[in-house]
Each structure stands twice: as C-alpha cells, then as structure tokens.
C-alpha cells in the first residue's frame, strides 16, 4: 500500500487533499475557499449575481439592444396574433409596432388609465378621446358621412358655385338680386330716403284709414 503524505503525486500530479483543495459543506451548499459551488441542485439565483429573472423580473440600468431583422423583436404573448415591437424599414430606422385583433392603444396618463387614450384599430381607424390640435389636417377622401371631416376644396367649391337653386348666395356686404325676393317680413333699420328705397311702415298711409292732415 502506498504511503500518502503531503506532496504525494499520481502520474506526476499532486494529489488533492483538504490542504490544497479545501472543500467545505455549509448546509446544502458546498464551498471552495468560502466560495459557493453551483450545481444542478444549487442553481445560481438572480439576486446573487445581478441577473434579470424570468420569474421574478428585474431592472436594467443600461441599454438593451435588439438587432435589426424580421426575426429580432420584443414580443408580448397573447392567445391571438403576438404583439411585437421591432425595427423596420430598409436600414432598421423605422419603429414597427404590430398589434392584434384589439388594435393598439396609447395611454398617456398610464397603462391602466383610459383618459386621453388614442386607439388604432386593425382596419386603420384612429379614435381620439380628447381634442386634436394641429397646424393642419390633410383629408385625402371626399366627405360622405355627416361626421366626416371635410376638405377646403370641397367647401370652397360649394361656396363659390352660384346656381339657381337654394345654394345661390347673397353677400352680406351688399349684392344685386336678379330674381324676386320673398320673405315673411323685411326689417329696415333706416327710413327710406331715396326714390328707389322701400319705405317703412311708419312712412306710409294705410289704405282706408282716416287721416287728419290739419288745415292748409
């Protein structure tokens, strides 16, 4: 039997022993020189190693980079089409947000607060819950519904087109009519002073009335 002692070797290598390979147990842990040895039983924990845990979450203090490409994205799982955020465009300089059947909702006041929410449906319809302020809004379609936003050319065309129907215009600043004017009553703020003026009621003598003109 070989006599094992400090410095004994096997095949030229020093035999490990408590002195040169210190292993110690601490409960269910095994320590090497006071350092914990991880194993299949004792796996690394996020809190011990500054990891972000799949189960417990965590906080990144530095940037997270997702490389450009159709297969590189941040995905939010659901029971339908996955919701994804990725870079798009020819060089990855476009933000692409892919929604599902419920559309996309932007909530400026908080993820659980619908005040001020902006919703985009899968059909491309956008709904605002508050007023929209912009230097200009461009409408590419001719309005058809009563609630549609109209276009300047549509309004200008309706105003500037003078026809013989009810859309014919009379300028408030003064105008000349080529047809008869019929109204229940006409109110004149000033009395007639020229032969072409229409007289007011207080300037005429009522038919069949008795007038006392006095003595001449």
Curated annotation (Swiss-Prot):
<protein>
    <recommendedName>
        <fullName>Tail fiber protein p36</fullName>
    </recommendedName>
</protein>
<comment type="subunit">
    <text>The distal half-fiber contains two molecules each of Gp36 and Gp37 and one molecule of Gp35.</text>
</comment>
<dbReference type="GO" id="GO:0098024">
    <property type="term" value="C:virus tail, fiber"/>
</dbReference>
<keyword id="KW-1230">Viral tail fiber protein</keyword>
<dbReference type="GO" id="GO:0019062">
    <property type="term" value="P:virion attachment to host cell"/>
</dbReference>
<dbReference type="GO" id="GO:0046718">
    <property type="term" value="P:symbiont entry into host cell"/>
</dbReference>
<keyword id="KW-0946">Virion</keyword>
<dbReference type="Pfam" id="PF03903">
    <property type="entry name" value="Phage_T4_gp36"/>
</dbReference>
<comment type="function">
    <text>Structural component of the distal-half tail fiber.</text>
</comment>
<keyword id="KW-1161">Viral attachment to host cell</keyword>
<keyword id="KW-1160">Virus entry into host cell</keyword>
<keyword id="KW-0945">Host-virus interaction</keyword>
<keyword id="KW-1227">Viral tail protein</keyword>
<dbReference type="InterPro" id="IPR005601">
    <property type="entry name" value="Tail_fibre_p36"/>
</dbReference>
């Amino acid at each position: 039997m070989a006599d094992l002692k400090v410095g004994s070797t096997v095949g030229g290598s020093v035999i490990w022993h408590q002195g040169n390979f210190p292993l110690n147990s601490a409960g269910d842990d095994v320590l090497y020189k006071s350092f914990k040895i991880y194993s299949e039983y004792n796996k690394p924990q996020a809190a011990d190693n500054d990891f972000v845990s799949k189960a417990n979450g965590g906080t990144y203090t530095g940037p997270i980079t997702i490389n450009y490409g159709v297969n590189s994205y941040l995905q939010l799982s659901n029971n339908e089409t996955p919701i994804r955020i990725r870079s798009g465009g020819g060089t990855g300089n476009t933000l692409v947000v892919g929604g599902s059947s419920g559309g996309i909702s932007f909530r400026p006041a908080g993820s659980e607060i619908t005040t001020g929410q902006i919703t985009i449906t899968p059909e491309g319809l956008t709904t605002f819950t508050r007023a929209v302020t912009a230097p200009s809004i461009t409408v590419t379609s001719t309005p058809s519904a009563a609630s549609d936003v109209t276009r300047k050319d549509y309004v200008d065309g309706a105003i500037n087109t003078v026809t013989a129907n009810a859309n014919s215009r009379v300028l408030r600043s003064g105008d000349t009519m080529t047809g008869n004017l019929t109204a229940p009553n006409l109110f004149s703020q000033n009395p007639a002073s020229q032969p072409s003026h229409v007289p007011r009621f207080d300037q005429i003598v009522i038919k069949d009335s008795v007038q006392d003109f006095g003595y001449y």
